[in-house]
């Protein structure tokens, strides 16, 4: 909060009011479709998979653990870890995606936004290649020259372990 002395200056008061108006408008997302329904948006930098679609449930992998999201879920903001996102549609079908990282936001109005760095449908992945990449990264770990190289290899190991788990 700005000190009261700053608000006495007419120019600053106008600036503060403009900022508050913008923040209030940006903080009010579009309402969900109705009671008991969940509006779901899922996108990557290159593709939109769902745009305000009504879905029954979304299962997400986060740094604090995997969890399922239903309508009226407690609001939360979580960081995604590499893993499987499962979207359960209203008609009972389930679609599975592999995400590398990103964030998921659950709002009080039952709207959910999932923004992922990279997204791939499972049918586009090769279990054999994931296993080979995992073995290669694990063998490179002991020969890492420095901490930066070691951290990079560890990330590759975690991502490929998640890929193998999702595909098995």
Curated annotation (Swiss-Prot):
Taken from the record, one Pfam family name reads ATP-synt_DE_N
Keywords attached to this entry: Acetylation, ATP synthesis, CF(1), Hydrogen ion transport, Ion transport, Membrane, Mitochondrion, Mitochondrion inner membrane, Transit peptide, Transport
Q: Which GO terms describe its biological process?
A: aerobic respiration; mitochondrial proton-transporting ATP synthase complex assembly; proton motive force-driven ATP synthesis; proton motive force-driven mitochondrial ATP synthesis; response to resveratrol
Protein's UniProt keywords contain Transit peptide: yes
Checking CDD domains in the record gives: F1-ATPase_delta (cd12152)
Where would you find this protein in the cell? Mitochondrion; Mitochondrion inner membrane
GO molecular function terms listed in the Swiss-Prot or TrEMBL record: protein-containing complex binding; proton-transporting ATP synthase activity, rotational mechanism; structural molecule activity
What does the UniProt record say this protein does? Subunit delta, of the mitochondrial membrane ATP synthase complex (F(1)F(0) ATP synthase or Complex V) that produces ATP from ADP in the presence of a proton gradient across the membrane which is generated by electron transport complexes of the respiratory chain. ATP synthase complex consist of a soluble F(1) head domain - the catalytic core - and a membrane F(1) domain - the membrane proton channel. These two domains are linked by a central stalk rotating inside the F(1) region and a stationary peripheral stalk.
Q: Which family does it belong to?
A: Belongs to the ATPase epsilon chain family.
Subunit composition?
Component of the ATP synthase complex composed at least of ATP5F1A/subunit alpha, ATP5F1B/subunit beta, ATP5MC1/subunit c (homooctomer), MT-ATP6/subunit a, MT-ATP8/subunit 8, ATP5ME/subunit e, ATP5MF/subunit f, ATP5MG/subunit g, ATP5MK/subunit k, ATP5MJ/subunit j, ATP5F1C/subunit gamma, ATP5F1D/subunit delta, ATP5F1E/subunit epsilon, ATP5PF/subunit F6, ATP5PB/subunit b, ATP5PD/subunit d, ATP5PO/subunit OSCP.
Identification of the protein by name: ATP synthase F(1) complex subunit delta, mitochondrial
Organism of provenance: Rattus norvegicus (Rat)
Q: What is the lineage of its organism?
A: Eukaryota, Metazoa, Chordata, Craniata, Vertebrata
Gene field: Atp5f1d
């Amino acid at each position: 909060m700005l000190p009261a002395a700053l608000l006495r200056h007419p120019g600053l008061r106008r600036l503060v009011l403009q900022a508050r108006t913008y923040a209030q408008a940006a903080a009010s997302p579009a309402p969900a479709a109705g009671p008991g329904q969940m509006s779901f948006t899922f996108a990557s930098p290159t593709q939109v998979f769902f745009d305000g679609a009504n879905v029954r449930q979304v299962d997400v992998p986060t740094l604090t653990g995997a969890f399922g999201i239903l309508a009226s879920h407690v609001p939360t903001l979580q960081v995604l870890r590499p893993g499987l996102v499962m979207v359960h549609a209203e008609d009972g079908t389930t679609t599975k995606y592999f995400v590398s990282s990103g964030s998921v936001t659950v709002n009080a109005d039952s709207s959910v936004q999932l923004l992922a760095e990279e997204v791939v449908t499972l049918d586009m992945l090769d279990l054999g290649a994931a296993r080979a990449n995992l073995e290669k990264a694990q063998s490179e770990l002991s020969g890492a020259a420095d901490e930066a190289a070691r951290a990079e290899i560890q990330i590759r190991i975690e991502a490929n372990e998640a890929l193998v788990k999702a595909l098995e």
